[in-house]
Amino acid sequence: MSQESNDDSLGIDKLSVDYDYLLYKIADYVSSIEFQTNQICKRQNELITKDIVNGIVDENIKHFREILTKCEKLENYFDMLDQINMITENFKTRLAQVARDYKELQKP
């Protein structure tokens, strides 16, 4: 009987080795899946973060362009004011000349 237990007639030792090997393969497979899942999640996170950052950057660029457009319009308004100032200065000079001419005509 002791020899039968040494011979492992029921195959318990082999079953134990097979079981351990199966657990090892399962753990290895789970680790592989975990690694791939982590890589995919990291990549997705990078894409989302990058897209969010890019979206924010794109939105900021859009706002800066709008501000730049407003600044250009403002600059045009100042140019118009300068032109109006030149016209009014010229008009004042001409009006003063007309007033002098009128006074000359009024003299007897």
UniProtKB/Swiss-Prot annotation:
Lineage: Eukaryota, Fungi, Dikarya, Ascomycota, Saccharomycotina
InterPro entries, alphabetized: CNL1
Keywords annotated in UniProt: Cytoplasm, Transport
Keyword Transport assigned: yes
Stored CDD domains: BLOC1_CNL1 (cd24144)
Listed GO biological process terms: endosome organization
Function: Component of the biogenesis of lysosome-related organelles complex-1 (BLOC-1), a complex that is involved in endosomal cargo sorting.
Coiled coil location: none
One GO CC term, this protein: BLOC-1 complex
SUBUNIT field: Component of the biogenesis of lysosome-related organelles complex-1 (BLOC-1).
Subcellular localization, as worded in the UniProt entry: Cytoplasm
Similarity remark: Belongs to the BLOC1S4 family.
UniProt gene name: CLN1
Protein name: Biogenesis of lysosome-related organelles complex 1 subunit CNL1
